[in-house]
Amino acid sequence: MYDYIIVGAGSAGCVLANRLSADPSKRVCLLEAGPRDTNPLIHMPLGIALLSNSKKLNWAFQTAPQQHLNERSLFWPRGKTLGGSSSINAMVYIRGHEEDYQAWEQAGGEYWGWKRAFALFKKLEHNQRFDKSNYHGTDGELAVSDLKDLNPLSKSFVQAGMEAKISFNGDFNGAHQEGVGFYQVTQKHGQRWSSARAFLHDVIDRPNLDIITEAHATKVLFEDRKAVGVSYIQKNMHQQVKTTDSGEVILSLGAVNTPQLLMLSGVGAAAELKEHGIALVHDLPEVGKNLQDHLDITLMCAANSRTPIGVAFSFIPRGLVGLFSYIFKRKGFLTSNVAESGGFVKSSPERDRPNLQFHFLPTYLKDHGRKIAVGYGYTLHICDLLPKSRGRIGLKSANPMDDPLIDPNYLSDPEDIKTMIAGIKIGRAIFDAPSMAKHFKREIVPGPAVTSDDEIVADIRSRAETIYHPVGTCRMGKDPASVVDPCLQVRGLRNIRVVDASIMPNLVAGNTNAPTIMIAENAAEIIVRKVDMASLDASIGFTRQNLEPELL
């Protein structure tokens, strides 16, 4: 029997396994549906280009047909290995905007506000450039670094942004977010530094930590609304793990799988569970609701030179040099995360904060990397940072081996399409600036014929895709309608918590890996210190005596 059963070894689960097993008197079990993270493509940064096609390492979900995207069903990759999506993502280290966490504080109290989050980000971080910065940490396990080998086109993009009257920002996680610049990444010595590498690998042999991979969780076991274990399937065999009398089940499967597992276990909207013949354990209607994600549209251009990372016979000599440089020195273009530079901008000057994010790629990227785009070109990803549209996760069936229903409901709020139109126009202005214009051969998409707002809207509806940041489906809050309380305990149940991106009340303005890791660190302290709702003050959140002194 275990004191803690953690379901999901992703960005959050690896942190929890590390922190909760630090007490040798506590037995911890970590269940992961995917395999161990031994595939070399995980650890070689440019391997990201091939991971979308890996069914072994990727859930490879498909959404429901999207009403406002021409009824298209969108591809939703999610990590399925130790490290979860931090093992297949673009490694971009972004915390979000301070105002994001002010909204979290309104929802869940002081323990989830910016002051607390900022201290935890610094505690977790081992930044290899900002060693004397007030905004970064150097003693944590999560390695954060500059890219080792920037493509010249990425530098040209930043210069062109400045020529287009966008200020340079040397640190998107510093004093302010707005501007163009180069992304820092979760890498160490030219290799991906996933949550598994940062928090799990060094403690994997702890005698009180059992890691069970290729274990597909099928149900949380309850006795009188108390979680007592988890059922899973491994190699076609049905298995169970149980908790001690005071033990806990912690769900860290992410914004898609966590609500699915809750519903399969009898926790969710009673009507939906009845529809699928699932016995009700607890009627919790908000499970799976409040789904938020960043929708993305691309500008793609052909280049007039061989400067980009190309797919062509002429690239073979450069590719071989890069391969040997990576093998022997951990340098060269294979250390690229592809999304090397970018920025945060406002769709209109009167806004008080950025609502658009750019990821610039010095290469072609087609269909999430699943299709090969031959030649030399470059791509700008443009996403709506603060979407107003809300969707849901539901069930397709009561079979735990079936994928859930994923309905992001993209562009259901008309404000979102207006933001994306502005993003296309700003992106084109950057590409028209001298430093990028000198590389330009032709615009591939949307294409030179797409100029009016109506034409841009039609293009967005026909091409927009996810940029992989789903959150919010087990919303945290002080209000009784929320799925989890500020201690991340599932409302109406005992001995079960949710700790992953699904608890976010609102989507952060940026990439979600770093905030998810921070959530897990905060949750671990809540659990270890036995903070409960009795520790809350109705007006200010957690009492100060429950905070670590160095985090005040």
From Swiss-Prot:
Keywords from the named record: Cell inner membrane, Cell membrane, FAD, Flavoprotein, Membrane, Oxidoreductase
Gene name as annotated: alkJ
Catalytic activity entry: a primary alcohol + A = an aldehyde + AH2
Coiled coil feature spans: none
Cellular component annotations (GO), alphabetically ordered: plasma membrane
Native species: Pseudomonas putida
EC number: 1.1.99.-
PANTHER family found in the cross-reference section: CHOLINE DEHYDROGENASE, MITOCHONDRIAL, GLUCOSE-METHANOL-CHOLINE GMC OXIDOREDUCTASE
Name of the protein in question: Alcohol dehydrogenase [acceptor]
Keyword Zinc: no
Binding annotation for FAD: 3-32
Summary of the function given for this chain in its UniProt record: Converts aliphatic medium-chain-length alcohols into aldehydes. May be linked to the electron transfer chain.
Organism phylogeny: Bacteria, Pseudomonadati, Pseudomonadota, Gammaproteobacteria, Pseudomonadales
